[in-house]
């Protein structure tokens, strides 16, 4: 009855009540707003940029392209804000700004975003995915041979962020490197980002729908892989995608 319900509520501490109301509000936001029902979480330098660009072409899929200021955006980073905000010069750090990314959703069935560090910072990402987006989000993971992935990441950092070490020295000095320099991009964890087992295991344990793609399959049989992705997202598998261009590999 209403009295026992009131007594039950009064058994909670103040902090517990606040947390309960916050979770309730978060689920209300999920229902009210057009928010992602799938995420491309990584790994970095494993074909995620190409997949993102191909998904944008599908009429049943919405991926954000601009932020509130009209600037181009691909990787919001929002769900791992506490891990990367100090290190990265790009990202969406505010909940209202994150929601704005999806304001132009119309009739698209699949709504998603791509942030490659969601795989590496899987504990933080999973916690916030569940809190902000719910438990039914579909997860897409691309994996590449760890050695090839590491060297590709090194080349990327050397070109865009000016890596100060040789590849060999960077591998030897990797332990503790992020802690020693708070301005470094997480991309410099060349070896650590290729230790996929715990990352993938955690996502598979926490979410019912996880789709894993091998980079080599995506590179060599992109049409077949894309069809598998479309089936996973439950969108039209016959849509023609221009997959001739490879992006940022």
What are these model-derived regions, one by one?
Residues 70, 74, 201-249:
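The conserved 3'-phosphoadenosine-5'-phosphosulfate
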Residues 1-121, 132-137, 146-180:
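PAPS-dependent sulfotransferase catalytic core
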Residues 112, 138-140, 211-213:
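Hydrophobic/aromatic beta-strand patches that form the interior of the parallel beta-sheet core
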Residues 82-87, 115-116, 185-194, 214-216:
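Active-site rim elements
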Residues 144-147, 218-220:
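Canonical radical SAM enzyme core domain
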Residues 98-101, 125, 196-200, 225:
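Alpha-helical packing segments of well-folded alpha/beta enzyme cores
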């Amino acid at each position: 009855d209403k009295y026992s319900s009131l007594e039950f509520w009064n058994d909670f501490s103040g902090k517990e009540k606040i947390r309960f109301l916050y979770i309730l509000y978060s689920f209300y936001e999920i229902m009210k707003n057009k928010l992602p029902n799938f995420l491309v979480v990584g790994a970095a330098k494993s074909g995620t940029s190409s997949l993102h660009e191909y998904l944008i072409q599908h009429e049943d899929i919405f991926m954000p392209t601009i932020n509130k200021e009209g600037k181009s955006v691909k990787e919001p980073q929002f769900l791992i804000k506490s891990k990367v905000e100090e290190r990265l010069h790009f990202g969406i750090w505010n909940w209202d700004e994150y929601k704005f990314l999806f304001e132009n959703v119309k009739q698209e069935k699949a709504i998603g975003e791509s942030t490659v560090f969601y795989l590496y910072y899987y504990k933080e990402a999973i916690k916030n995915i569940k809190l902000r987006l719910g438990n039914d989000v579909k997860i897409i993971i691309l994996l590449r041979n760890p050695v090839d992935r590491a060297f590709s990441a090194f080349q990327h950092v050397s070109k865009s962020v000016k890596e100060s070490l040789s590849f060999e020295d960077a591998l030897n000095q990797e332990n503790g490197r992020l802690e020693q320099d708070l301005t470094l991009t997480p991309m410099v964890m060349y070896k650590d980002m290729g230790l996929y087992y715990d990352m993938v295991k955690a996502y598979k344990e926490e979410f019912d729908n996880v789709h894993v793609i091998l980079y080599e399959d995506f590179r060599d049989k992109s049409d077949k892989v894309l069809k598998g992705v479309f089936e996973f997202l439950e969108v039209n598998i016959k849509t023609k995608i221009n997959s001739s261009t490879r992006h940022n590999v």
